[in-house]
Amino acid sequence: MSWQQRIDRALDERRAAEAFRRRLPVTHGAGRWLEREGERWLNFSSNDYLGLSQHPAIIAAWQQGATRYGVGAGGSGHVSGYSEAHRALEEALADWLGYPRALLFISGFAANQALIAALAEKDDRIVADRLSHASLLEAASLSPAQLRRFTHNDPQQLAQLLAKPLAGEQLAVTEGIFSMDGDSAPLAAIHAATQAAGAVLLVDDAHGVGVIGDEGRGSCAAQAVRPELLVVTFGKAFGVSGAAVLCDEAMADYLLQFARHLIYSTAMPPAQAVALSAALRIIRSDEGQQRRDILAARIRQFREGMGEVSLGLTDSVSAIQPLIVGDNARALNLACRLRDAGCWATAIRPPTVPVGSARLRLTLTAAHHTEDINRLLEVLHGHSE
């Protein structure tokens, strides 16, 4: 089979399964409203949980950073791209989250892949929650280590897998809040299982940091857990982009030597680091707490308003509120129905989620108003005019 035949077959299969992905260019894709081609919809697809992507102080910080540093880093942080702005952000993150060190990455995907690629060796074993992010599972499957997946949020099965004989080291992998189901990991029990086995725990808290816990320190702090490796990302609550790995001194030095995604990538623009430092100050402030309180109120309003609706609402109490409808066509039709009624929501289909669990991944933010949630509920209950 030629390359072209292989490509054509794969695309045909996606189309036949109603799983073909398309991008739609928008004027504004974050915040309360999504704007496209002169129209606007209430936006229930953005990960901008605290509404910070449009915050004037963060926008001004980026502009000031660009004036001072320019618009690009100019190279890898190992060459000339590591600025005072990067160092200040790393130090602030480490202080906030209670770790000796923080290392910046250009994305959460890159951070997760870099960690596993740098750490996993032939005789090792990676034990990951089966619903972990694609970046984690892909890196684990491509590594020389043995990959085992435990049943979602099942610390007992994790402990059983970690107890099996092994010549090398073990890495347990999970998320704080899962990106497609919106549920939380039982981190205290997972941490206890990894400690008992002498394993290292990696937690990706992309959807928890900034939103949960005191000063928004995230899922781990809220459950009084301190994993050896904590990944936080900046494209959700921070309203920007990028990521950081929190760890101890020795691990940070090791990653600086062996994390290829860090070594061989141009560093994030210093202006972005300035903006992220501004976002962090807001997240830690009274304003940040007010935004978290507003988000929590919107989540309660939505869940109480859903009542006994027939759609498959999960147990999530996070900003991610999936409605699992099962069939791809039904998910697409429901997304179109919402769009026609002025609400933008995205249908998520396999392979992003398991076959038979297509869904609308609704996301709520602090930028939403009470009437926005009411409108969404009206449409979902079938009362849209």
From Swiss-Prot:
Substrate binds at residues 21, 133, 352. Homodimer. It holds the Pfam family Aminotran_1_2. Gene3D superfamilies: Aspartate Aminotransferase, domain 1, Type I PLP-dependent aspartate aminotransferase-like (Major domain). InterPro entries: Aminotrans_II_pyridoxalP_BS, Aminotransferase_I/II_large, AON_synthase_class-II, AONS_Archaea/Proteobacteria, AONS_Proteobacteria, PyrdxlP-dep_Trfase, PyrdxlP-dep_Trfase_major, PyrdxlP-dep_Trfase_small. SUPFAM superfamilies: PLP-dependent transferases. Pathway: Cofactor biosynthesis; biotin biosynthesis. Its cofactor is pyridoxal 5'-phosphate. It is an enzyme of class 2 (transferase). One of its GO terms (molecular function) is pyridoxal phosphate binding. Pyridoxal 5'-phosphate binds at residues 108-109, 179, 207, 233. Catalyzes the decarboxylative condensation of pimeloyl-[acyl-carrier protein] and L-alanine to produce 8-amino-7-oxononanoate (AON), [acyl-carrier protein], and carbon dioxide. HAMAP family: BioF_aminotrans_2 (MF_01693). The modification N6-(pyridoxal phosphate)lysine is found at residue 236. This is 8-amino-7-oxononanoate synthase. PANTHER family: 8-AMINO-7-OXONONANOATE SYNTHASE, CLASS II AMINOTRANSFERASE/8-AMINO-7-OXONONANOATE SYNTHASE. Belongs to the class-II pyridoxal-phosphate-dependent aminotransferase family. BioF subfamily. NCBIfam families: bioF. Its EC number is 2.3.1.47. CDD domains: KBL_like. GO terms for biological process: biotin biosynthetic process. Keywords: Biotin biosynthesis, Pyridoxal phosphate, Transferase. It comes from Klebsiella pneumoniae subsp. pneumoniae (strain ATCC 700721 / MGH 78578). It catalyses: 6-carboxyhexanoyl-[ACP] + L-alanine + H(+) = (8S)-8-amino-7-oxononanoate + holo-[ACP] + CO2.
